[in-house]
Amino acid sequence: MAIATLAGGCFWCLVKPFTSYDGVKSITSGYSGGTVEYPTYEEVCTNTTGHVEAVQIVFDEQVISFSDILDIYFKTFDPTDKNGQFFDRGESYRPVIFYHDEAQKESALKKIDALNEAKIFDKPVVTPVEPYKNFYPAEDYHQDYYKKHPVHYYQYQRGSGRKAVSYTHLTLPTSELV
């Protein structure tokens, strides 16, 4: 099994896109990259912990590759915005790919280069690729939010602008690029 740790705005919206893929074993919402141990949601929202809202995905590399995980990831948010996502602004909502080994780092950098070269987006992809430091699972009420609160989840996606972008911002599958 392998692990991918990815941030792209509100973690509620990063879970569901991965659930329908074979080889994805678990998806946990949490906080990653900061200096405060075991932060709470309230602490992370102050933008003083260094953490971002992220998901940690456990996957079977024999079934789905890290590159495939990145293909799904880049269809879920705006990678040209480094200051948050949609109406969620600030440090805790910035996108980040946290790599767990050099192969993940290389794959992420190649994927970003390919997206930029293909000019998939109107602006350059600015999603940073950073070494993995830590991950703290979020409070239980944040886990599988789309299942626990489907009406609110849907309203949040539509109201934030994320739903429209997740369907339209890629004009061809990123898997064709790398």
Give residue ranges: language-model regions.
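Single conserved hydrophobic/aromatic residue that forms the stacking wall/gate
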Residues: H169-V178
